């Protein structure tokens, strides 16, 4: 099963960024697949970013950002993943000396996805996800898949 990171979804929505066309094309390829899972953690982050004027030049209002996220939630072919019992593992990572603060968000997402059987992850942040047991982590913006 494949899942898609927030950064890919954001670039697909943001026509002002140079990655837009490639990200949007990747989502079009994925739209009809039945082996895609979207995680609520990713959608919550997408909602926040779509509304943030430091991230996008034309931030959305709450209802508009929510509708973007609902569009992904409504894809009948895609699985919708929520939480998983992964926080004990996340807190073990949190206690690791010199761990980057933001690493915990990626860890929680990765462990949640793996708990639900996701084995492939599309992201711009390849290095943040290589240590979690995915069979494939890749950047669909810079590679052909």
From Swiss-Prot:
Gene Ontology cellular component terms for the protein in this record: plasma membrane
PINc domain: residues covered: 4-123
Enzyme class: hydrolase
EC number assigned by the record: 3.1.-.-
Cofactors demanded by this protein: Mg(2+)
Pfam families, alphabetized: PIN (PF01850)
One annotated GO molecular function: magnesium ion binding
A single GO BP: negative regulation of growth
Assigned keywords, A-Z: Hydrolase, Magnesium, Metal-binding, Nuclease, Toxin-antitoxin system
Family: Belongs to the PINc/VapC protein family.
HAMAP family: VapC_Nob1 (MF_00265)
Protein name as catalogued: Ribonuclease VapC24
Organism of derivation: Mycobacterium tuberculosis (strain ATCC 25618 / H37Rv)
């Amino acid at each position: 099963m494949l899942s898609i990171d927030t950064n890919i979804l954001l670039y697909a929505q943001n026509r002002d960024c140079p990655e837009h066309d490639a990200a949007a094309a990747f989502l079009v390829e994925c739209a009809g697949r039945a082996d895609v899972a979207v995680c609520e953690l990713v959608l919550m982050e997408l909602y926040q970013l779509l509304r943030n004027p430091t991230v996008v030049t034309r931030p959305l209002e709450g209802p508009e950002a929510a509708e973007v996220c609902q569009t992904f939630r409504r894809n009948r072919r895609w699985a919708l993943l929520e939480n998983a019992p992964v926080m004990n593992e996340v807190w073990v990572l949190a206690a690791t000396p010199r761990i980057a603060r933001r690493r915990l968000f990626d860890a929680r997402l990765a462990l949640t996805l793996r708990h639900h059987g996701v084995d492939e992850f599309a992201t711009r942040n390849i290095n943040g996800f290589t240590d979690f047991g995915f069979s494939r982590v890749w950047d669909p913006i810079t590679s052909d898949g």
